[in-house]
Amino acid sequence: MAAIYLDLSALRLPSMDPAVPDEQLTPGAAQAVGHLVDAGFEVVVLALDDEPMPPLGDGVTRAEMLPEHLGAGTWYLTGDPYPALGRPRGGTTVLVGPRPAAGKVPLPRFDLEARDLAAAAMEILTRDAMA
């Protein structure tokens, strides 16, 4: 089965205070990840060693970096239009959460956009079932 790489920004609610780190999981995030694991996907959370791993249950692994190239059927989910770990080549990219307001410089393109992690998981599961 294909791999799904999850940036922490796709899993956490943004803090109202920039001085306070984002630690609260978005509602339904653990359940959405559980559905992906149950469907046979390899779910990998991208987090540095000093960042705590969110409680997502069994079957979820951790990596510090994205692979240089993602193969066909591989997914990358992020809540940040400019991810700290960069953007991969290949695979399917998904921007999760509300889209920031457009400024003078256009936002980077993503293959898909989803309102939350549950909607992104539903899209992945639907596309997998239809393949």
Predicted regions located by residue number:
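Asp-based, Mg2+/Mn2+-dependent phosphohydrolase catalytic module
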Residues: A3-L8, R12-P18, D22, H35, ...
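Substrate-recognition element of Asp-dependent hydrolases with the DxDx(T/V) motif
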Residues: Q24, A29-L56
